[in-house]
Amino acid sequence: MLNLKHFRCTFDKYQNFKMEVIHNISNYFPKKPSIVTIGTFDGVHIGHQKIIRDLVSKAKSEDLTAIVLTFSPHPRMVLQKDTQLKMIDTLDEKRQLLETMGVEILIVQPFTQEFSRLTAIEFTRDILVNGLNISKLIIGYDHRFGRNREATVDDLKQFGLDYNFMVDEIPAQDVASIAVSSTKVRNTVLAGEIKKTNQYLGRPFSLSGSIVKGDKIGRKMGYPTANLEIKEKDKLRPNNGVYLVQSHLNNKICFGMMNIGKRPTVSGKKIQIEIYFFDFEGDLYGNKLKIELLEKIRDEQKYESLERLGNQLSIDQKSCQKLIPKYL
């Protein structure tokens, strides 16, 4: 089971730390040599976290600037025209995660067709050496870079010798002998396998957005819900169903149950996200909210009446509350 207390303690270390975010590498002007890692870091999963921890630790011990170079949009959206690709984290969620891990500078490089045509040697010389004043590069075991992903880790190590920087290669991080990747994380979310998702992420998968007014059907059944609206269209959503969730409300953790789906019992037409908190009273309309998913309870179903649906919600609440002690 995911140890949430350990996760909170680990990330609270940099709770008041402020990371600088720079859009486009041309806007960065090095003040001292840097230690850099490169990637999309979608999900910032446990493999990414190993790289980031090494980056921050070595930056401190070697007096280097800790830089994460990432790309937006995701290269697949540009190179493969993959308009269906959904992101595990929004750019802002990624920013928050990297900041809590102690990264000094996040450079968000616009990924364009022109940028993708840089050869490996051009990327090394123009971006890493001249642009970032690199002293050390930390990368994952499967990293490839340059036009058409032409260069490997071994190529990078040779470039390091040529341009006088070190290259540290980080091995795969496993969960139950399975190498973790963003694709594996994405697949578990889509399958509703949230417990496995959270193992891969080392933290709860989350959804963030604004609370908007709904049609108050839940309130009529005794289950007033907060309706979450996510503005980012490419944000990954889990498959339809009921989930045990938690959120930080009024400086404390509140548990609840979330339904994501079209609400077939009331002939809903579009996907909606509704959360009922067990021990919270108050008006959340207009607030920004981050919902952390802990476990899936069941798939979405259609019921003959609102009364039948209400009975099922009571069962769902009891199922959720039995699970809560595991997360305290």
Where are the regions that the model predicts?
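Residue-level signal for inorganic ion chemistry
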Residues: 45, 98, 137, 197, ...
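Phosphate/ribose-recognition catalytic cores of enzymes acting on nucleotide-derived substrates
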Residues: 214-328
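Glycine-rich, Lys/Arg-enriched anion-binding loops that position phosphate/diphosphate groups
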Residues: 160-257
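N-terminal catalytic cores of NTP/NDP-binding nucleotidyl/phosphoryl-transfer enzymes
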Residues: 25-90
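N-terminal Rossmann-like or analogous alpha/beta NTP/dinucleotide-binding catalytic cores
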Residues: 77-141, 145-163
